[in-house]
Amino acid sequence: MKTLVLITSQFPFGSGESFIDSEYPVIARSFEQIIVISQNVSSEKTRKVVTSASVYRYNTTTSLSGFLRLPIQVLANFSTIQMLTNEEISFRRKAENHPSIKNLYILLKKIIKAVQLKDFIKKVLAKEGINESIVFYSYWLKTGAHAISLLDYKNSIKIARAHGSDIYEEKTEAGYLPLLCYSALRMNAVFFASRDGKDYIERKIKVKGRGFLVSYLGVTKPDFGETKRSETDKFVIVSCSNLIPLKRIDLLIKALETAKTEKPLEWLHFGDGILRNELEEEASLRLNTKNKMNFRFMGHYANNELLKFYNRNKVDLFINTSSTEGLPVSIMEAQSYGIPVIATDTGGVREIVVEGTGSLLPVNFLPADLAKLIEYYIGLNEENYKAIKGNAIRNWESNFNAASNYRDFLIKLNSIFTAGSTDSSSLI
C-alpha cells in the first residue's frame, strides 16, 4: 500500500484519542507515505509520528476569513450539498424517521463541514503530489468519513472505524447523527469497535454490509522493567474517565458512601473535565466523614503514565459507571493488569466484561446496587479473587492485545485494498 491519509479528531495533538498510540506504530510500517489530518488546531503535539509523515491541522470552526469564503464554497459544491441533503432526507423518510427543522439545520452544518474538509484533503494531496493508490482512513464515522465518501481517486479505498459516540444516535444530545448511514454505506469497509455497534448499524440501515467488520481495538502492556509493586492493606478502587455528565461519577461517589466494609478503602479517579470541582466537593461532603475511606482525584494522566501506575501499584477493582459506551479502552487497560471490572451493561461493554472477569450493572442502576458489588469484591477470598485476575489477563491477551489485533487489522486492510482499489466499490 502506497499512501495512508489518516483523519483524526485529536491525534497527534492534545490528550484525546490516546488509543491511536498503540495502533499507529503498527500500521505506519505498511505505507510508503503517511499524511495525518487532525481537527485539533490548538493543542501542542504530544505524540510521535514517523519522521516521514506529513501532519496537517484542519480547523473545523469557521474563522472570519472562512466565513467570507463560505458562499463561494457553497456555490462551488452546490450540487454535492443538494445531493447529500436529498439522500439524507430520503433515507430518513424510508426509515420513518422524518428529520425535524432542528435536525435539518444540524444536517446542513454537517454537510458544509464535510464539503470543506473534502476540499482541504484535495488541496493537501495536490500539495504532496499524490493522486492515486491511497488508503483514506477516518478514525471516526463522523466528519472525516463524510468527507472521504465524496472523494474519488484512482486505485484508492475509503475505510472508517466506528466506536460509540459516532454511531449510537439515541444517546447523543440531539438524538441525531447526520449522514451516518450514507457514509457507512460508501466506505469500502467500516471497522466496528464492538459487535453491538455493528449490529446497531445493520438494524438501522436494514442492510448487512459486506464490508461491515468487527475489529476490536487493543492496548499494549509496556515493559517497565523490574518493579516492586506497592503494598497496602487498603482495598484500592480505580475509575478512569473524563469528568462529564454521561460518565456519572456521582453515582460511584454515592455507592462508596453506601458501601459497608471494615476494610480501609481508597478510591482514585484518573481523568479531568468540566465537573471536576463539583464532584470533588460532593466527594468531600459524602466521603470525608466515612471511616477508613480515602479518595483522590488524580487529574489527567498520559496513557503511558497510567499504565505505569497500574504496573507499580496495587489496584483491586476498576469501576465504569457510564450511561453510554462503545467498547472502553480503559477496561482493556485494567484487564491487561489483571484488575477485576464492574461496568454498566451498555454498548459493547458485555463483550469485554465477560463471565469470570468482573460484573455488569444495568444502565439505570442505583448506587445501592453498585455498593453491594463493591462489598462482594472486598469480601472475596484470595483463591476466588486470583481466579478473576487470571481470567482478566487471559481475556485481554486473547481479545484485546494491540499487537495481535492491529496485525489482523492490517491483514484485512491489505485484502480490502487489493480488491477495492481495482473496482472502487463501496458497500452498496
Locations of regions flagged by a protein language model:
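A charged, aromatic-enriched C-terminal amphipathic alpha-helix characteristic of glycosyltransferases
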Residues: 305, 365, 382-415
